[in-house]
Amino acid sequence: MAMNHQGMHSGHHDYTPLLIAFLAVAGGVLLGMIAAIGNPILLIGTIALFAMAILAFAPRLLFWAVLAGGLVVAGLIRLYLPQLQAFRWLVAAGAIALPFMLAFHAMFSHRQGESTSFPSFLIWAAAFVAYSALSAFILSHGWASAILGLKDYFQVWGLLPAFLLLPARPDFRKTLLTLVLAIGVIQVPFALHQYFFLAPLRAGIPSVMPADIVAGTFGGDMNGGGNNAAMAAYQFFCIAIVLGLWKNGLLGVRRMLALTACLAVPVFLNETKVSFVFAVLVFVVVYWNEIRQNPLRFIQAGVIFVAILATFVMFYVFVAENTDRIHGLDQYLDLLVEHNLFRGYGTYQLNRATTLTFWFSEHVPRDLFHALVGHGLTQTREASAFVDIGTTLAARRYAGMGIGVTALSGLLWEVGLIGAGLVIALFVSAFRLAGKLARECRDEPIRQAFIKGTQAGIAVTVLSLAHKSLFMFEVTYQVFVILLLGYLAYEFKQFRSAETRQPAVIG
């Protein structure tokens, strides 16, 4: 009887397979016609659009496609197929459409027992989105500028509510963890190719560091910069997870060392100096409880950790000596200090430190209004294919200065102390929530290791705000950031679903 009852579903029919079949047939006919024309870009574009249409009926598949597309495909297209860069926008289009598709499916799925709670860091996120939109149009420098600014800031933020709208499945966490670590591992072959084959081709380009192109799947420009720091941040996120799995007894020493070494190879190759600080942050966050409870054991582990850092330093010194940039460790350390505190970054007059002091001197006390609210989105941009950069603050008043050389300085100039404060509050709230969730799942070692690794990833992201400007426009890095925040939101929802069905806002 139970089987018969389940078989009769109130006359409900699922037409999704028929719709997908129709789209596939229609797409095949259209693709045949376009192939006859012989335009490869038009052909690829049509394939991508039909793939998006089919994925509309499979939002879970679209979710994984956006994650993998943002962390792998988008960066590779930018570096290896720059003529197809427009297709990177498909990641943004998928991220925007995804929450609407999931919400639509949720309306007809009749889910039971799922919490409607949401973490408090989402309030800070929503406040930043609302404030940025308000700033874009009140401090408007034209509709195109406002729309471009909002697109650059929030092009993949649709992934954040998507994590909350995903229906709970027991295999989701394992699948996500597998994907995260797999993407970390596949950075290795790409980094090796970029180091041995692409970096030497950049040796003669003025004001360009050859090793910056070693960015794995996070992309770069053969004639400009690369997202090597973004790849380093992602690799340390993966390393933090591996350390957590080892600490919780899920990995043996040999496997832990092998995985850590594999994940660290791209970081060694791309010479990202901030990796030293990333490593310290990861170590402290993952082992914070042990540091507080057993300082002596921490000192012992710290000796090993310092030895690893020393290996990093000596490798970088060796590479620099062989490229005739410096001679000896002392000169290398002097170069680091000069590069970050005294000399301009690249071709700019300002560097990561002086861009902040310059912002302060330009606003306090003579322009407190713009210090609070900023000058408007895109005002630190010095190049764009869609907006007349001659009207931006960076091009009009501060040409060649580099006022947006980091995300922190860029946020201060564009959305002021209010906007920058909302971003900091967002990450602080998420960091604290990760700590609480990790304490709540002591009996679930895989879950705790993943959450603790995410907490370390958030710490790395906060530091990155003062190191690079990627947070404000780079789709690959933004997918990584939203992955961290979205996973925390998902875990929060799972905890609340296990406790209560009543709406709540905590965290």
Predicted regions and their residues:
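Alpha-helical transmembrane segments of multi-pass inner-membrane proteins
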Residues: A51, A133, K174-G204, M222-E290
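A membrane-periplasm/extracellular boundary helix in multi-pass inner-membrane enzymes
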Residues: Y195-L198, N270, Y287-G344, V364-R366
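Transmembrane alpha-helices of multi-pass inner-membrane enzymes
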Residues: A24-G28, C238-L243, F427, K452-G507
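Aromatic-anchored transmembrane helix interface
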Residues: R88-F100, S120-A133, G142-L166, G184
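N-terminal signal-anchor transmembrane segment
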Residues: G11-M107, L134-S135
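Interfacial loop-to-transmembrane-helix boundary motif in multi-pass membrane proteins
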Residues: F63, G113-V129, K151, F163-L192
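Long extracytoplasmic/lumenal interhelical loops at the membrane interface
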Residues: L201, G346-V415, A434-R442
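Loop-to-helix entry and N-terminal half of a specific, functionally important transmembrane alpha helix
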Residues: A258, G402, W413, I424, ...
